Each structure stands twice: as structure tokens, then as C-alpha cells.
Amino acid sequence: MCEKLFLPRITDIVIRGFNFDLTFEDAAARFSQQEGTVVLLSGSDQDCARYHILAADPWLMLKGSGNTLCVKVKDSAGGFVCHQTDQDPFDLVDALVKKLSFLDKRFNLPVAAGLFGYFAYDLKDKIEDLPQTCVGDGLPDICLYAPSVILIQDRQTRENRLCLPVFDWDKGQKEVLAREEYFINRLKHSWRPGSFHADNAGLVSSFAKPEYLSAVLQIIEHLRQGDIYQANLSQRFETGFSGDAYALFLELFKKNPAPFFAFVQAGDHQVVSTSPERFLKVAGQTVETRPIKGTIARGETPEQDRENARTLSLSTKDDAELTMIVDLMRNDLSRVTEHDSVEVTAHKRLEAYDNVFHLVSV
């Protein structure tokens, strides 16, 4: 697939120190209305929350659902040419990553090139044969972008790095300088914070209370029968929304600065995501997951804060839930890693956030 598309190979990454007068969030805002912009913000002082990342000006887009995928590649005129394929999405992404990734160890950056975006839950259908119980929302199962510029801010050192890929189809430094100039000029654009409105009625669940209680009873019966040992009973909340999704993103980050905030400008839809929990991190040949089970509010006084932390640490229920998830993740990772290489380096670690305490394992 990649060869048929004549995709370029990244031969180098130009990395420059980069200073600007804007906050990182305001700098990213200049790109927030352009499709393919991905913003990753890190809040708190946890060891997994060191970097802010902006990926912008994509030269490749990958979108699709089911057996229909579209790879769009920017042409010499600045437009995009779409190539349809029915290739397995995981095989396609694997081929693209191998083609487009570039490991640069000069500055110990978390990323210098690659694909940014999301995988939807419905991609599970490519791996597992499970019942279809959800109403489709019309959004793609996969949405990924390859940026031509990445800005990284180190929250510890306050240093900024601008990463510009060099392709084998570039004729010299001219193309790289053009990408840098585009980015700098974009930062000079005037910008005023947007606004948004959510329905006053609030969030509406996909479950009515009787249906939810009935589902709980069904799960309990499955547990008794030995059909399952764990279930994640999920419900979907929705409300009417209008306005600037990036403004919502910034407002949520201001109120609860969790380690993993993500904004994806996907053109006809936007994704705003926040979580204190790392699902997966792959660095070289190492895979890390950080499940969280166990949450309690921060106290209003130092004494109450300490008491809440102690209560959570001693909670038998939360300990059991976290231990079960750790065992589940160990099993899942063992399926794709070397035999006897999975280990728990930290278990039931108490982490303090602005509004809550969490129990975390690594």
C-alpha cells in the first residue's frame, strides 16, 4: 500500500530551539481550526506529565471505517489526493509507522515524527467477534494525521523544540525552511478566545435507571455462574453543544489539569479527551501501562486531605479492583511481549491531583 502511494521516507529531523511570547495553549490555538491539528497537554506534576505537544499542518491523513479506508497525501499544489483501500487498518498503520517514524536521540524528546489521532473502540471488530450493541455515531473508526511540524514544550526545563521532518523527496533546505516559515507566520495571526455553549438540561445518559439496575443484576448473575469474572458496565452521556471545541478543551484543562489532555481537530468533528490514566506507552522495545482504580476527593483542610489519602490507601474494595486490573493488563501484555518479561514496578501508588487522589500501578 505504501509503495503504491509513493510515500516519502523521513531521512532526518531538523530540530531547533524555539522561543515565542505566547503561552503554549495560545500558540496551539492558532492552529486549532485547521484539520489535522492535534494538541496534547500535560497537567499536574506527575512523572508522566512532562511535555506539551502540538502537531500541525499534516501532509498525510488516514480515515475510515469498516473495510473502507482513505489515505490522503498532500500533492505539490497543496491539495490532498485520496487513495481508497480495503487493507486491514492495523496492517496499514504498521506499514505507515515503519515508513514515517524517525527516532532522534539528540534531545531526548518524546516524539519527533509519526502519526497523531485516534483509534475508535469499534476497531475491536477487526480483532474480536463480539455483539454489536451500540448505535453508530457516523464517525470514523480510525483518524490519523502525519504532521509536517511538531512543537514540543518541556515543562521541567521550559525549553521549546520545533521538529521539522526532512523527506527523501525534498530537493534541499528550501522545503524545510518553508515549513518553518509557515509555522512562524501562523503564530503571528491574531486570535481571540472562542466561546461555547452546552444545553442547560445537562448530560443525558444512554441508560434509564431501571435499565441500568437490570444490567447490574445480569452481571451479578453472570459472575455467579462463572461466565465472567469482571465487567465494565459503561454508559454514554450526551448533550447539545455549540461553539468552539478548543475553548471547551482549554476550560476543562484549566479546571482539572490531568496528565493526559488531547484535542483532535478532525474537520467535520472534534475530539476533546482528558484522563489521569495512561493506557499504553511504547518506547523502543518497552511497553508501559498505568491502570488506575480507586479515587477519593481531596480534603478541604490539610487534616482532611491526609485522612482521605489514608482512607483510600486502606480501602479493601479499591485494592481488589486495582489488583484485578493489574492482573488483566499483565495477561494482555504477555500476549504480545517476551515470555516472563512483564513486571509490576509500582503497585497501589497514591498519586495526588488537583481535585482527587488516585491509586495507580505501573
Where are these regions (language model features)?
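Extended alpha-helical targeting/anchoring segments
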Residues: 1-362
